[in-house]
Every structure is written in C-alpha cells, then in structure tokens.
Regions:
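Eukaryotic scaffold repeat domains enriched in small/polar residues
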Residues: 1-200
C-alpha cells in the first residue's frame, strides 16, 4: 500500500492498483470461501480440517496497458498530494499484470461467481467534469464485467459476461441463471435490473 501523511499528523493510505488482495465471502451452506489472487485459486473452508481448493491452471495473466498504468499513477499521485503536497511515489510500482480475480460472490444456488480482471477499455471522459475547476481526475480506463462460475464441488461451468453499465456494488443477487444488479444508465442514474443468462 501507499501512504501520505498530513503535516499536522495522521494521513491516508491507498492500495497499490492491481496488487493482489485477499478476498473472502460466505456460502449459504455455512462455510467461508476465500483466496489471495497471486494465482487463480481459492479455498472452500468446508469444516475444520476440510478444505477444497479450486484452481484454474490454464489462466493467462491480463496485462496492464501502459496508458492504463499512467492514468492510475496520475490519479493516485493527485489524491496523495491533496494530503501531502510534497508526496512522491517511492513505494512499489504498479504490477505489469493484473491478478486473476478481484472478488468472489456466492449465489442462492450455492454457485461461486469469480469476478475476473479483464483487459481495460478507455472511455471518453465526461467533458463537464473535466472542465470544472479543481475537479478530481477521472478514471477513463475501465474493465468490462465478467465472471467465471463454479459449482460448489469445484466443477467449472463457464464464463458469464455482463452488459455495459453492470455494477458489482452493491453485490448482485444471484438465483440460478437469474441475476439482479444495479445498472448505471446513460446519465449515470442507478437502477436495479434483472438479467437472465443466455447460454451459447
């Protein structure tokens, strides 16, 4: 993580973009699921002494695009210098590749949905926000939302790609092949939408 301190004491801490962070959630079956995505694996803590590890050995790392890296460095530096105007980036650099996943969700049918890191796409910035004096820099490189889905016994079911605007915050509600999630429309107005998975 990266740190900046106020001259009067105290400070702020930012996670290093794309550095692996531990992820944890709970299954409706009563056990914890978690992992540290330094590789594509996570564990189901079924009972004391019983752990099921799910791993994809065919996973290929997603690279961080040079312009994407530059944007994250610029935004982090801006936020840190709001705390300490003399702040300089002296910690570890942004990794060259992204972790395999960034979050875990469990549906009501007990299936495990792994939120994947994807290649980012650059969106046009909001000109109204960028023209505003003192406006915070915008994140224009964003990743499409995609999940790998597993049965609780570890069987891989496939990848699910979500439509544009799909948000994973708050956590989507998943029941079988139906998903309820917050979607942000053209004016960035949030609303709840229901999706049904289409199988190819």
């Amino acid at each position: 993580s990266l740190m900046a301190t106020y001259s009067s004491g105290g400070g702020t801490q930012k996670y290093l973009p794309f550095a692996p962070r531990g992820v944890w959630t709970f299954s409706p079956l009563g056990y914890m699921i978690g992992g540290l995505p330094t590789r594509y694996s996570f564990d189901l803590f079924l009972a004391p002494g019983r752990v099921l590890r799910i791993e994809r050995i065919d996973w290929r790392p997603v690279p961080v695009a040079p312009a994407e890296r530059t944007e994250h460095e610029r935004i982090v530096t801006y936020m840190m210098r709001r705390v300490d105007p003399a702040w300089r980036w002296t910690g570890p650099g942004i990794p060259d590749v992204k972790p395999p996943y960034t979050n875990l969700f469990v549906g009501e049918s007990r299936r495990i949905w792994v939120l994947l890191h994807q290649e980012a796409q650059q969106n046009a910035p909001d000109l109204e926000d960028t023209d505003e004096a003192g406006a915070d820099p915008q994140l224009t490189w964003t990743e499409p939302v995609a999940f790998d889905v597993f049965e609780p016994d570890g069987r891989y079911l496939g990848m699910v790609r979500a439509p544009k605007g799909f948000s994973t915050r708050p956590s989507p509600v998943i029941r079988g092949d139906t998903v309820w999630a917050v979607v942000h429309g053209a004016l960035d107005v949030p609303f709840v939408n229901r999706f049904v998975i289409r199988r190819d």
